[in-house]
């Protein structure tokens, strides 16, 4: 689903700091602008929905513990 892909792109960026073009390559050659848009969509959704924001932040926190 596009929601899952967008969240994944956001999380990869937050955890690794990878360049947008490199994240795009992980997702079958999506362009850097597609990745940027996806990250912006997730940031907007997080700003509008505190429960969603906490869920994403918890995922990131749990992944950083490994």
Residue ranges and their predicted role:
Residues 12-13:
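Short helix-to-turn junction characteristic of helix-turn-helix DNA-binding domains
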Residues 4, 16-19, 30:
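Residue-level signal for the short linker/turn that defines the boundary of a DNA-recognition helix
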Residues 7-8:
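Pre-recognition alpha-helix immediately N-terminal to the DNA-recognition helix
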